[in-house]
Regions:
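Active-site beta-strand termini and strand-to-loop segments that position acidic
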Residues: 60-62, 174-175
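Conserved acyl-donor/pantetheine-binding loop and adjacent beta-alpha core of acyl/acetyltransferases
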Residues: 53, 60, 66-110, 125, ...
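Conserved acetyl-CoA pyrophosphate-binding loop and the N-cap/start of the following alpha-helix
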Residues: 109, 113-121
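Short loop/turn motifs at secondary-structure junctions and domain boundaries
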Residues: 47-53
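Conserved GNAT-fold acetyl-CoA-binding loop/helix
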Residues: 21-46
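C-terminal "cap" of GNAT-fold acetyltransferases
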Residues: 132, 137-143, 149, 155-188
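Conserved N-terminal entry element of GNAT/NAT acetyltransferase domains
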Residues: 1-14, 177-188
Length: 188
């Protein structure tokens, strides 16, 4: 399968949201009952600030977006435009971890390396801005991908929703690889 990685644009928003909805329904739905899947939409989805910041990637098969994800230099850990608890505060790369955010793959393209490809792009971009640590909040569906890519569990958290249904997640982190730092700083 040949794919192309590129930065997302605001023109991609509708297609990204449709992909996220499908991914949540089918991939998260393999772990949760229907009520918990519906509640998940409150804490997941597209944060267009990532697109505006130039830190959100898409993976295309032909002209079709089959995966997406990004990283952030801002304090928000997870959630879409509609989610509460967001913060636009800029992180200090010397003392804080860059955030890996909003990773989604079309269910028909799952487990084909798309998530790993997006993670590598996020890592290289964050390293280029001086970040040495990556952190994220993983869903139960995403946790195996992150573990396979060197992220370790910091803590298990239950994220509350307005429906009164908690969504089990895992806060995970890892250092930026030496190769990403070298790629971000040629000669370094």
């Amino acid at each position: 399968m040949t794919t192309t990685l590129r930065l997302a644009t605001l023109d991609d928003v509708d297609e990204l949201r449709a992909l996220m909805t499908l991914s949540i329904r089918r991939l998260i739905g393999a772990y949760f009952d229907a009520d918990r899947v519906e509640a998940s939409y409150e804490i997941m989805g597209l944060d267009t600030q990532l697109i505006e910041d130039g830190t959100y990637f898409t993976v295309l098969s032909g002209e079709r977006i089959v995966g997406c994800g990004g990283w952030s230099r801002r304090a928000t850990m997870f959630g879409g435009d509609h989610s509460g608890g967001r913060s636009s505060r800029l992180l200090d790369p010397a003392t804080e971890a860059a955030r890996v955010r909003a990773m989604y793959t079309h269910p028909d393209f799952a487990r084909r390396g798309i998530g790993t490809r997006v993670l590598a792009a996020c890592e290289a971009a964050a390293a280029a801005e001086g970040f040495t640590v990556l952190e994220l909040v993983a869903t139960v569906a995403g946790e195996p991908l992150y573990a396979a890519n060197g992220f370790t569990l910091v803590e298990r958290i239950d994220v509350p929703t307005a429906r009164g249904i908690a969504i089990p997640c895992a806060r995970m982190r890892r250092g930026v690889s030496v190769n990403a730092v070298r790629g971000a700083n040629p000669g370094g």
